[in-house]
Amino acid sequence: MSIADKLKTIAENEQKVFEAGKKSEYDRFWDNYQDKGNRTDYGSGFGSCWTSDIFKPKYDIVPISAYMMFNNSKMAIDLVEHLEKLGVALDFSKATSTQYMFQSSSFTRVGIIDVRASTNSRPLDSTFANCMKLITIDKIYLKTGAVGEFNATFTNCVALENVTFEGSITKNGLNVQWSTKLTKASIISIVNALSNTTSGLTVTLSKTAVNTAFETSTGANNGSTSTEWTTLIGTKSNWTISLA
């Protein structure tokens, strides 16, 4: 074997040793941080110090406490896509505490938010407040009949376009007036989720979003007076649907 070949072999072996060392450190860190997949308390678990290069969990994340879990995260990524590439699931179906979960974070997309197991009277309290880069929430499963007020849930969600609700909205406080880019499908989902059995309650939407989504022709910007819109909100006459 020539000297050049020997040097090449040494370099290749060094790289293999280096990669093995990195894998060992990765395993050691995440085995400890996630308790080998048994961790359930993720309160404030992934805050402002985490980057997408570091946030590469080894195990599925199934929190019981998700309080402030991603609060103030600076990761401006599609969270769903990021975790799918890692083969890791994020499952909130057992979470009993979800307040402030994504507050002031920089994610562009989050997946399924399930608050049906919540034991808090306000499970969506400030959950997405000040998420100014958030475009898509795949779905929010509501705890029908037990969800408290939507206190500041979507405050300053100025980029939000897509959100789907599953369940019934039975309390005051849902306000998405900052979300001027909401799609027609998202607005319809909100209206359809409004309880048919409550009365005297108010929901606030963006007039700009409604005007654009329900406009009668491109550029007309008249959706809030369109027949389609008035017919839709007519199905929820027990609610005050305010446009701001």
Please tell me what each predicted stretch does.
Residues 1-28:
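Short, low-complexity N-terminal tether/leader segments at secretion or assembly junctions of large
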Residues 18-244:
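Negatively charged
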